[in-house]
Amino acid sequence: MKITEAKWIEDFKEGKINGETVEVSYKTYEQAKSFYAKEGASLPDNTLMYTVYTCHTRNDHTQNLNWGLTVMEPVCVAQECNVTRGHFHEDEQCDEIYVCQKGEGLLLLMDEKGQCHAEKMREGSIHHIDGAFAHRLVNTSDSKLEVMCCWPIN
């Protein structure tokens, strides 16, 4: 029997994922300004807001899953906590799972009628996101918020 190494390794101490086919994207304040009600005059445009690690599989079968990690910095913009870009999924059948790895924050959820609610995130909490809900993360603490994510490829 052939034994191989895992394609991906999540480094829990460093808050990152290493390995094959890992895409890393960075969101700076300049790219995130539209997420906030007011601009943060004292915040440089190149301030790192969050990093996303995505583990891609090599095929596009509908049943396949993506795995990722979002690492949010403890940054405030004009007294608003750091947030990710909120979004609806194109396919409402695509649910998602979030697992809070480190830190504290909120998972904001909104239905198609604009009704909102939030779930507290803390280390070890597991959150199911219905595919029909828009969602975004909020880092409410003074340390990094690290959230593992699993969602369908489509």
Task: Give the predicted meaning of each segment.
Residues 1-6:
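Intrinsically disordered, low-structural-confidence terminal and linker regions
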